[in-house]
Amino acid sequence: MYCCYFFCIKINYMEDSEINDLRGEGEFKGFSFSKFKKAEVKKELLNSLIHSKIEPACYWSAELICAGHYTDLWEIILLFFSKFVHLGNSSIGIYLEMRINDFKTIINNGYTDSTLRLRNNDKIRKLFCEIMCILCDAKRRHSFDNVKIKPDDMNMLTIKDKFKAPTASYGEEVLMTEDPKELFPFVNELAYSVTKTGNNQMMACYWIEWIFEYENRCKALKEKIFCERRNFAKVDSKCQKDIIWIIWDIFLKESEKRTKIIQKLMNALMSLFCLKYTTGCHKKRKNLMYLAISILCEDFTLEKEIIRHSQAGLVNTIKQKINSVYVQIKKNEESTGTEYLFHGMKSSNLESTIKKLDAMNSFGETFVPRL
């Protein structure tokens, strides 16, 4: 796939990189702005992050931005952080929560009806550029291995051999009146596994996967399975009764018994998990739950800096030159060819209104993300 170096290019005006494309959101379905297959772009972006290649990461993220594929972009960001960074620098979870809130603020200041126009917003470009730089620089850990559930594991007669909890009190802390009673023994085991007493990371992951498999079997039999509504889940109300929130209820309640920073980390992970949540997306985001378990079960050193101090200057330099990426992408736009007639003209009334509404100032020249 095509990629080149951008940050040696000097860009003087935002107009040089302003995207004026005739295509609507529907025309980008399955493709990036430059007509690469979206699946391939996501793969290239993830590989760029894995191999710490900042410039390609900025390019491929911009391809998704210019096509309005923000959900896909955030999914790649969450996947990379939760699977490849996790305890290497878990503080990045708090940082990402901050940036998601910044992203929502920008959208709510005039872009709710047309997310494609976000591609020309300078703060959006710098926001994702900064995220790419920080993820590329992040300290890594070995990726989590998926825990497999065997068919025999669903046998209710033999599964009891895996039970370790000494009492039923662990599950009683989280189970509510309308929660499915048949799940209680397994919820109790999961809750015990993440306590300081039980402290069994492998079994905690096992019980999560067991609950997932049980839910899948119920759906296959067309049996509805829901829990009592958990209002702490900031998702669509129809999704607040998904079984997954029992698991997060366990994590949140256990974190309340730990230090303030662990509580803050857990709340941040919960917030990341809820981003554009739909029933079934927990499979894509289960590494966030694996990370939550690791935080509760492992001794780890919490990094206070989101990025190495020596790299902070480089990040700011790249942010200031990010428009050079969009200059390259602009070459692939589909337009009338008459944009030169409007070069230098003032923005539309809507754009001017957005600028007045936009009071956020999170991207200073010398900004260094730090807890």
Regions found by a protein language model. Give the residues of each.
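Short, charge-rich, low-complexity alpha-helical interaction segments
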Residues: Y13-E27
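Conserved helicase/translocase motor-coupling segment
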Residues: E44-N47, K53, S61-E63
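Active-site-adjacent structural elements in folded domains
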Residues: F28, K42
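C-terminal alpha-helical interaction modules of replication/initiation AAA+ assemblies
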Residues: E25-G26, P56-Y59, C66-L371
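Generic helix N-cap/helix-start motif at coil->alpha-helix transitions
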Residues: F36-E40
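Cysteine-centered motifs
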Residues: C3-C4, C8
